[in-house]
Amino acid sequence: MAKVLKIRDLTLRDGQQSSFATRMTQAQVERCLPFYKDAHFFAMEVWGGAVPDSVMRYLNENPWTRLESIKAAVGDVSKLTALSRGRNLFGYAPYTDEIIEGFCRNSIESGLGIMRIFDCLNDVDNVKSTIKYVKKYGGIADCAVCYTVDPKYPKLSLWDKIKGKKNPAPVFTDDYFVSKAKELAALGADMITIKDMSGLIPPQRVSALVKKLKAAVSIPVDFHTHCTPGYGLASVYAAIAAGVDVVDTNCWWFGGGTGAPALELVYLFCQKLGIDLGVNMEAVAKINESLKDIRSELNTSVFGADKPAPKPFNPLVDAVPAEVEAELNRAVKAAQSEDFATLLAAAQAIEAYFGFPAPNKLVQEAEIPGGMYSNMVAQLQALKAEDILPRSMELIPTVRLSAGLPPLVTPTSQIVGAQAVNCALDEKAGRPMYHTKNNQFVNLVKGEYGKTPVAVDPEFRFQICGVREETNYDISKYQQQPNPELPEAGGVKLAENEKEVLLLELFPLVAKPYLTNLKKKAYEATVAATAPKAEDTAAAAEVKQPITGKTVLAPLPG
């Protein structure tokens, strides 16, 4: 077990994205920054994910300003981190190497220290370019292996077994994840992250996986998870006991629930084990003072009401309640003895005492991401077909296996979920399966997202796409976004520099109106600044008044 544990703080990116729809304004971020400089986190995740899109779409702010302002405030005390989807970067389409290189260079020049790179299919080919360019410009390549689980197949009847029918063999074994990590390390990864976006990894699994990864690669291992199904805190405790190098946490008011575990609960556990986090908890307490108010502001602006919050707690000044102390001791003992059932019960009891959200049992039992489930519900509600939700859920394993068993992470989780709903609707209407297909599902089966963990049956691909051969996305067909001149802004270009061009390429639907509005305002301000002031105009008019009256022809007095 390591005696030093590094902390990556997620509060300003994943934390606000998971709990507050990524609506934290620049002004709110800046209220926390003086204290972040003193906190000495190993890393701070502040960019990527939904942040660049949301700050333009909802806040009318500049994504590059967000990154650069945090760098200016924090300096080199903590490494700033962003989340990138491999060849898709922050967008959803595969980009050319020219765009990937420009994006990596500008990100690092603007203050980024670590790029966390993942691919929704765990297709290593999709992350090669980003790794190369991040390292070329002096950044740290944090390569993530997306954790996912095998489908829950229906139980076979005795008759099925007699006939020799078998469910598919497991694909997402520990060896699968270790193999991916070794491939990434060979490409130049500087660290490996177990990225559990859905919070589905239980403590016993992460304990085994951390040990195997530590034995297989010589670079640091990070663990990222969420608390939605209730495993998060216990799994972080198990990973720490297994010797993980870095864990991802949120500050108290943004911790738990759909987010990552609260740092303070990790701190209490590590205190018992004599593990140093290298974090100034006094500065963290000051961050939390700001975040408490910001949490309330976001609840009002985003949800229209204050949501239940955990009890206030500062481990430096508040006595640890006796009930929590007992559960912490139980958790430490259980983690050391690998009694994972007891560890899970103790961790959940600690969170319950402080009032963090209870585990989402539906997500836990279905073993699918919470966002995937909620999107399926929304799709069926829009169609007034909520009655087929159970059947849609039953079809997920079938649809997923047919499509090559993609990991259930963004965007493949949404693609599989939407297609399962389509299949259930087809079935209800008496149509054959896959009569209704969404374009993203067709592209996934065709191969445009990359190689799936399991090969797609060529006949199924022909049924869905009209071709039997796997066909990857043709980067040579990529067309850059138009960059017109704006007459309403004095004829300037929509994107005037490389950073603006990158925003336009990655987020065309959002960046176009954002940049147009930005240029119009700048032009209007320039026009207003150069226009004569009203008082000057009046004075000039007064001077130019014609002289009237009778002219006297007489010498002036001496």
Each model region followed by its residue ranges:
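N-terminal amphipathic alpha-helix/helix-capping segment at the start of soluble metabolic enzymes
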Residues: M1-S19, L67-A72
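Terminal or standalone catalytic/regulatory effector modules within metabolic enzymes
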Residues: F35-V55, Q336-T551, P555
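Catalytic cores of alpha/beta
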Residues: K161, S179, P229-V244
